[in-house]
């Protein structure tokens, strides 16, 4: 399966039991900031934004004072799982980022998708990739 198929079929799909509800944008990005696959709607990000995200995984709490920035959008960092998951909130939407051995799995959502639904979709794929040694 191609990386794009993982994004299309496992991240940008309808939320289980909620037809028509899906993430706004999603991507799989290598730890080095290289995009493996992304939805057409995933924001163009700056290298320093990705560096900040990677630093927060290695030093949990790094982004809390300044917020998480991606594609020029600022998210307030909310409780995640140190070294494994970063979660951010902006208005009625937000972002979930799951770290695997080699990649970061991103999910961005807006109203109609709940934070819990985004977490479930992103973390399920991230956990699967971890099980595969990725």
UniProtKB/Swiss-Prot annotation:
Location(s), subcellular: Cytoplasm, Cytoskeleton
Protein name: Profilin-1
Taxonomic lineage from the root: Eukaryota, Viridiplantae, Streptophyta, Embryophyta, Tracheophyta
Record PTM: Phosphorylated by MAP kinases.
Family: Belongs to the profilin family.
Anything else known: The variability of the residues taking part of IgE-binding epitopes might be responsible of the difference in cross-reactivity among olive pollen cultivars, and between distantly related pollen species, leading to a variable range of allergy reactions among atopic patients.
Cysteines joined through disulfide linkages: 13-118
GO cellular component, one term: cell cortex
Gene Ontology terms for molecular function: actin monomer binding
UniProtKB keywords: Actin-binding, Allergen, Cytoplasm, Cytoskeleton, Disulfide bond, Phosphoprotein
Record Pfam families: Profilin
Complex and partners: Occurs in many kinds of cells as a complex with monomeric actin in a 1:1 ratio.
Role of this protein: Binds to actin and affects the structure of the cytoskeleton. At high concentrations, profilin prevents the polymerization of actin, whereas it enhances it at low concentrations.
PROSITE patterns: PROFILIN
Species whose genome carries this gene: Olea europaea
Residue ranges annotated as motif Involved in PIP2 interaction: 84-100
Modified residues (Phosphothreonine): 114
